[in-house]
Swiss-Prot record:
Activity regulation behaviour: Ion channel activity is inhibited by hexamethylene amiloride in vitro.
Protein name: Protein Vpu
Domain observations: The N-terminus and transmembrane domains are required for self-oligomerization and proper virion budding, whereas the cytoplasmic domain is required for CD4 degradation. The cytoplasmic domain is composed of 2 amphipathic alpha helix that form a U-shape.
Residue ranges of the TM segments: 8-28
Family: Belongs to the HIV-1 VPU protein family.
Keywords: AIDS, Apoptosis, Host membrane, Host-virus interaction, Inhibition of host innate immune response by virus, Inhibition of host tetherin by virus, Ion channel, Ion transport, Membrane, Phosphoprotein, Transmembrane, Transmembrane helix, Transport, Viral immunoevasion
Reported modifications of this chain: Phosphorylated by host CK2. This phosphorylation is necessary for interaction with human BTRC and degradation of CD4.
Recorded topology in the membrane: Single-pass type I membrane protein
One record GO biological process: receptor catabolic process
Note: HIV-1 lineages are divided in three main groups, M (for Major), O (for Outlier), and N (for New, or Non-M, Non-O). The vast majority of strains found worldwide belong to the group M. Group O seems to be endemic to and largely confined to Cameroon and neighboring countries in West Central Africa, where these viruses represent a small minority of HIV-1 strains. The group N is represented by a limited number of isolates from Cameroonian persons. The group M is further subdivided in 9 clades or subtypes (A to D, F to H, J and K).
Cytoplasmic side: 29-81
Residues with the Phosphoserine modification: 53, 57
Any matching Pfam family: Vpu
């Protein structure tokens, strides 16, 4: 074999190794990005649910404060015996 053929074979092998390394890094980064998107979606869903449950509890608080204003200090504690 001539030196040019040997050099071209070595160059192809090196190029293949570099391509494998680069695509492996790309694959790992894509997995990280997709995992982070899933985490972000879960965090958004948790925030939405927390906001929803917070709104419901505010409504309950308003109803309880309205009862207290009507004269019932403790709705569960009635001593009318």
């Amino acid at each position: 074999m001539q030196p040019l053929q040997i050099l071209s074979i070595v160059a192809l092998v090196v190029a293949a190794i570099i391509a494998i390394v680069v695509w492996s890094i790309v694959f790992i980064l894509i997995r990280k990005i997709l995992r982070q998107r899933k985490i972000d979606r879960l965090i958004d869903r948790i925030r939405e649910r927390a906001e929803d449950s917070g709104n419901e509890s505010e409504g309950i608080r308003k109803e309880l404060s309205a009862l207290v204003e009507m004269g019932h200090d403790a709705p569960g504690d009635i001593d009318d015996l």
